[in-house]
Amino acid sequence: METMPNWLMQRAFLTPDRTAIEIEEEKVTFMQLHEKVVSVCEHLTHVGVKRGQKVAVLMKNGMEMITVIHALSYVGAVAVLLNTRLSREELLWQMDDAEVICLVTDQDFDAKDIPVYSFAEVMNGPKEEASIQEEFSLEEAMTIIYTSGTTGKPKGVILTYGNHWASAVGSSLNLGLRDDDCWLACMPMFHVGGLSLLMKNIMYGMRILLVPKYDADFIHKALQTRGVTIISVVSKMLTDLLERLGAETYPSSLRCMLLGGGPAPKPILETCVEKGIPVYQTYGMTETSSQICTLSADYMLTKVGSAGKPLFQCRLRIEKDGVVVPAFTEGEIVVKGPNVTGGYFNREDATRETIQNGWLHTGDLGYLDEEGFLYVLDRRSDLIISGGENIYPAQIEEVLLSHPAVAEAGVVGMTDDKWGQVPAAFVVKSGEVTEEEIIHFCEEKLAKYKVPKKACFLEELPRNASKKLLRRELRQLVEEM
């Protein structure tokens, strides 16, 4: 069993006085961060958190969440990171599925039969000496993050210490490291993209400028004045920043904008080239511990729409009906690497279906060009990407079908200037119901970003001979609106 020194403890030993985290007016060194984490460990130990247990974390970006995530790794517990934008019903389902022993949160939450510990109350309570892991086994689970499958049923992706380590190493081999690097972190840490920055922070010894909540004005100013060298963004954020930048440009010290959540439109990339802003487009998912492919800034205009090539220790191919296909042939994107999950929690069926001989079948469609650059054609075919959040129509359809006046339901993405896409619903009625009532019904059961922005009524939904819903025809109806 391969082990490594506890990452934060080792970093605090190697560079104790180096700045680890900046948040608002607070600066914390790696040694100070380690000391904070030990204190959280002792409080969590008092409330009964032990090695091997799964603990749900429902917190917003901030020093408190950072210390909780590290503290759980210190005691050997698995952090189940919950999306703060989900509804109570969705969160309860995930906690039950993950078999968590308690919830640590910074907000009011009634978790029924699961003990809920307010971070503030825990830290004001008694301490107990903690048994701290001085080494991590790379094979052990560190986190579980839920991702929706093509059926809409969430699956808990198990990411090991080895997965997180490989992801950080792959990123460093791709982007390089500098002594003056500072990564501006504005992505939620309950997403793997945001979480991966915490791993890089302690592994690289790199300063993180943490933004608790997305604030385009603050981020724009920080890029100009705070010595930021790298930032992770999605297309909407990039558009927001360019609007604020106007005729100016950012300092040359900004060496990378890492763009996820789908490719950027060519006009935006052209503007970035004119202003000397290096945009690295990426492709990844929870199952790959963040990015697995990156298109470097060298190719941002010559390979428009491409997600680039795999990270150094990763492999990628395109398969159709189980056969590897040549360049320019569309098929399923299949990936392999030490950053790829070994499977889903308590979902052996989904694990067997998705991971075969170490290769992860993403369900995404794409092709490779003659030079091996990846082009993603469809994100898991029916996926709606809204402001960087993944939305699966099947989950919304399940909610719609639970309404007594709904006989059939179909959901597709509708183009939106602000969010990229938003859900649009098509409904066949079995009783009297209005569009407003449908939307209000969804608001009570779904996260806000998953609620359909439009509900249209049809006599029947388009289906093929096998009665399978023809979403492409629904998309055509949306385009004709």
Curated annotation (Swiss-Prot):
Recorded hits in CDD domains, A to Z, give:
OSB_CoA_lg (cd05912)
Cysteine-cysteine disulfides: none
The residue ranges crossing the membrane are none
**One MF term from GO for this chain?**
o-succinylbenzoate-CoA ligase activity
Q: What is its EC number?
A: 6.2.1.26
Q: Which domain of life is it from?
A: Bacteria
Q: What class of enzyme is it?
A: ligase
Q: Which reactions are catalysed by this chain?
A: 2-succinylbenzoate + ATP + CoA = 2-succinylbenzoyl-CoA + AMP + diphosphate
What keywords sit in the KW lines?
A: ATP-binding, Ligase, Menaquinone biosynthesis, Nucleotide-binding
Q: Name one GO biological process term.
A: fatty acid metabolic process
Q: In which pathway does it act?
A: Quinol/quinone metabolism; 1,4-dihydroxy-2-naphthoate biosynthesis; 1,4-dihydroxy-2-naphthoate from chorismate: step 5/7; Quinol/quinone metabolism; menaquinone biosynthesis
Can you tell me which residues the record assigns to a coiled coil?
none
Gene3D superfamilies in the cross-refs? 3.30.300.30, N-terminal domain of ligase-like
Q: Which PANTHER family match?
A: ACYL-COA SYNTHETASE (PTHR43201), MEDIUM-CHAIN ACYL-COA LIGASE ACSF2, MITOCHONDRIAL (PTHR43201:SF5)
Family per record: Belongs to the ATP-dependent AMP-binding enzyme family. MenE subfamily.
User: Which function does this protein serve?
Assistant: Converts 2-succinylbenzoate (OSB) to 2-succinylbenzoyl-CoA (OSB-CoA).
* NCBIfam families (alphabetical): menE (TIGR01923), PRK03640.1 (NF002966)
Q: Can you name this protein?
A: 2-succinylbenzoate--CoA ligase
Q: What is the lineage of its organism?
A: Bacteria, Bacillati, Bacillota, Bacilli, Bacillales
This protein's gene is called: menE
